[in-house]
């Protein structure tokens, strides 16, 4: 039995969240009556309202109105007034991942998992399948610039979704094809241990049907170890590793883009295909690897090499993934969602390869628990930045943890040899700090999952205003 075509109004609590908004948009496009509320009138709420979806700012019991089904994210507390009213009325309440799983049953599905790179890889898979005429439905964890949204309703057989492992609910997703980009210690507040995270990813792969397959990056040692423990499922490996089935070769990261070639070797004796002169207009080896994963899926689904080449070259990127927000005095300012040490290191490495100038990193640590559990990694992931400006921790509702804050991170960076790490007292002081640091050819990279994105977009104008005052 699949999701009925006729359901009463479906109410999303937290509809402005990136995952919730995508599901709501697709369900609206399928003809369901959708409504929802969020604490803030953010970009996603406004976008959904423009599409004709009824939205409410603030959570109140009366918002449910005639709703017959309620969808909630894991961020919603049990004492939320709308959730309490739904339970008082004995309405069905489903988690975000459960509703996504129901939507996936309408299509054949590619699910993209991994600690890092999910959103970009999901976008790349969607772009390549679209270029191959497969017209996929897409539900992503970030805004795909070419679509202006994180969700797209296609007419084709395939759906491409980002599989969020943060609360373990990605195990509910019925994928035919799975991608695993990497596996690192993250979301330990939910899983409790790294071993539990690895077990969850193994279960994710084991859930694939016998006629499906998994695409896994064996450049990452934990993923390579997992490949060795998977039985009875078809695995396609990718990476720079010489043993990879789909091998990334000759990566050139100069000029703010990635040039590379890919060699595909099937387990069939003698089968070999080389794709040369591939260009992705995004910097960083991590993005070249993401593109290689997407290429592996597209090739398996019959997308022609020339269509893959054109689609990669025209890829418009994803919002908050090395997104250029402006320029001042010849220096480029970027916004990036990177908030885990592995992500920060990859982004700064990409920035370093893309410019001959200086790289200034502005970081807003996200959550005290993350800073505490990965503190040593945070202290050593900024080596490619000439200067690190550290803002106060974005708490995301957490209580402070003694010994893990902005100042201890600055001290930790310095004690491990970084030559220029400074504390930012207030966001209003950022332009003044940056003003004395950058010139033509330099990069300023704003990093974090909090509200630092607003600073990144405001910074070019604030720097210009400072310059006008000085004149």
UniProtKB/Swiss-Prot annotation:
Pfam families associated with the record: Mur_ligase (PF01225), Mur_ligase_C (PF02875), Mur_ligase_M (PF08245)
Primary site of residence: cytoplasm
Keyword Cell membrane: no
Enzyme class: ligase
KW Cytoplasm (keyword) present: yes
GO molecular function: ATP binding; UDP-N-acetylmuramate-L-alanine ligase activity
UniProt entry keywords in alphabetical sequence: ATP-binding, Cell cycle, Cell division, Cell shape, Cell wall biogenesis/degradation, Cytoplasm, Ligase, Nucleotide-binding, Peptidoglycan synthesis
GO BP terms in the entry: cell division; cell wall organization; peptidoglycan biosynthetic process; regulation of cell shape
GO cellular component, one term: cytoplasm
Reactions performed catalytically: UDP-N-acetyl-alpha-D-muramate + L-alanine + ATP = UDP-N-acetyl-alpha-D-muramoyl-L-alanine + ADP + phosphate + H(+)
Protein name per its UniProtKB record: UDP-N-acetylmuramate--L-alanine ligase
Domain of life: Bacteria
Family membership: Belongs to the MurCDEF family.
Compartments reported by the entry: Cytoplasm
Amino-acid positions noted as binding ATP in the UniProt annotation, renumbered to this chain: 114-120
EC number: 6.3.2.8
Involved pathway(s): Cell wall biogenesis; peptidoglycan biosynthesis
Described function: Cell wall formation.
